[in-house]
Each structure stands twice: as structure tokens, then as C-alpha cells.
Design a protein with these regions (language model features):
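Conserved G1/Walker A P-loop phosphate-binding module
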Residues: 1-113
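A structural signal for isolated positions on well-ordered beta-strands in alpha/beta enzyme cores
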Residues: 54, 160, 193-195
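Short beta-strand/turn micro-motifs composed of small residues
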Residues: 57, 137, 163, 198
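Helical mechanochemical/support elements of P-loop NTPase systems and associated helical scaffolds
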Residues: 87, 101, 122, 126, ...
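Catalytic P-loop NTPase motifs of RecA-like helicase/translocase cores
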Residues: 112, 143, 169
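Inter-motif core of Ras-like GTPase G domains
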Residues: 116-140, 145-162
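Canonical P-loop GTPase G-domain recognition
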Residues: 167-239
Length: 242
């Protein structure tokens, strides 16, 4: 988390002071070079109000669809059956938010079809390189998602929980599901907000010949968009800016 800049001192000066205070052996410096560089880049981005938001979660929960809904057009490829994203891809979001110069929305690979160690490494990489993480669920939270959430929080990463595909349930069922997710969250995550959305809702359409087809409907991501529109207030409450 990035704290307010002390009066009269630049972020560059603070960053240099921090790097000089690191008590690392030559081997440790080589080993942690990537992490130190990532943190340095993040500090400079936040100083200039350039924010990177990552969509993160299991394969097929609708990460790409959510980002497309925020863009209001298809900019990320989707595959309904198995998920499509193989590597992180970021695109500038042309959406005006007060006090922010730019926002990059980033699609990340799914975490459910990779080995446990690699999955943990991916969660850590997301924690290091992005300023806010949207952890997307499409049902009750799983042990894989809880573990990834703990890694993100333990590394100081602000997280919003997003429950997608809410068009599939009745309102009372959504309420019960949200409560179940809250009950399963670890203590360090109890205060995290859970937003309910439908990134790519579909409904059955009956044709005159009796055939039934699935028809795409308008996305419902207004609650999430409204939260992001609060700009600095949202990012302060999440811990991006203090």
C-alpha cells in the first residue's frame, strides 16, 4: 500500500531511501530483483495516478466477460466452455474517473487448471504488478479461491470480491449465496465487499417453430461501475491510496 507523500519529499527520494535501507546479500538482490523493480514501477504509477486493475479468478468464471461489460464492447476474447485467456493482457479503459489520469484493465489466466505451486506464483505475481484485484466468483467460494485471496491480502493487495452470473439465481438465493461466501472468508478478509453482477446474462428465447435458443442480454455491472466511479474514495477505502 502506498502512503501519502511526506511534505517536501518526492517519491523518487523516498524510493531511493527505501532501496538503500534494504539489507540484502548479493544473492538476495539478484533473487528479488524482479519484485523490487515491480514495486518501484507501482510507486511511480500511483504517484502519477495511473491505476492497473486485474480481473482474477478460476477458469470460466467470466473474467473476460466482466471486462468487456465495463468496456461496453468486446475487447477481450471469450470462450464460454473452457475459458480462453492464456496470459495477462491489459487495455486502457477510456472511462473518465475523477483524480485518475488513466486506468488499465487487465485480464489474467484462470487459476483452477494449473498446479498448486504455479497457482500460488500467479497470485503473487498479480499482487506485485496490479493496484486493485477483482477476484471473480461464479458460485460459493472454493478452497482454491480462498488460498489465492489469502496470498493477495498477505501481500498487501486491495481486493474486491465479485459474484458473477447472478442472473442464474432468484434474489433470495443470491442473498443466501453472498452470506455463505462471507461465512467462509478467512478473518483477514471479513471486511471485503462482495458485489453482485451479471457480466454476460442470457435468457431462453422460444421461436415460432418451437425451438428454444439462448439469447444474450444486456450486462448488469452497474454496481461495480458505480464503485469505481467513486474514484479516489474507492481506492482509499480499498487501500490503493492512503
Amino acid at each position: 500500500m502506498i502512503r501519502s507523500q511526506p511534505k517536501g519529499r518526492s517519491y523518487d527520494a523516498l524510493l531511493k531511501e527505501w532501496q538503500e535501507c534494504l539489507d540484502l546479500s548479493p544473492l538476495e538482490k539478484v533473487h528479488f530483483e524482479g519484485e523490487i523493480q515491480a514495486l518501484s514501477e507501482q510507486i511511480h504509477r500511483l504517484e502519477n495516478r495511473h491505476i492497473r486493475i486485474a480481473a482474477f479468478g478460476r477458469v470460466g468464471v467470466g473474467k473476460s466477460s466482466l471486462l468487456n461489460a465495463l468496456f461496453e464492447k468486446k475487447v477481450f476474447a471469450t470462450d464460454i466452455a473452457h475459458g480462453f485467456t492464456r496470459e495477462a493482457k491489459g487495455i486502457q479503459w477510456n472511462h473518465s474517473i475523477a483524480n485518475l489520469k488513466s486506468i488499465e484493465l487487465v485480464d489474467t489466466p484462470g487459476i483452477s487448471e494449473i498446479a498448486s505451486h504455479d497457482r500460488d506464483c500467479l497470485a503473487l505475481e498479480v499482487a506485485l504488478h496490479y493496484d486493485l484485484v477483482l477476484l471473480i466468483l461464479d458460485s460459493d467460494i472454493t478452497s482454491v479461491e480462498i488460498n489465492a485471496l489469502q496470498i493477495l491480502i498477505n501481500n498487501g493487495k486491495p481486493v474486491l470480491l465479485i459474484l458473477n452470473r447472478c442472473d442464474q439465481w432468484e434474489p433470495n438465493e443470491i442473498g443466501k449465496l453472498v452470506q455463505s461466501i462471507k461465512n467462509r472468508l478467512p478473518n483477514i478478509a471479513k471486511s471485503i465487499a462482495i458485489e453482485t453482477i451479471s457480466a454476460a446474462p442470457r435468457k431462453a428465447k422460444i421461436y415460432s417453430n418451437g425451438r428454444i435458443r439462448s439469447q444474450e442480454c444486456e450486462p448488469d455491472v452497474y454496481s461495480l461501475k458505480n464503485i469505481l466511479d467513486y474514484s479516489e474514495t474507492t481506492f482509499i477505502s480499498c487501500g490503493v491510496f492512503l
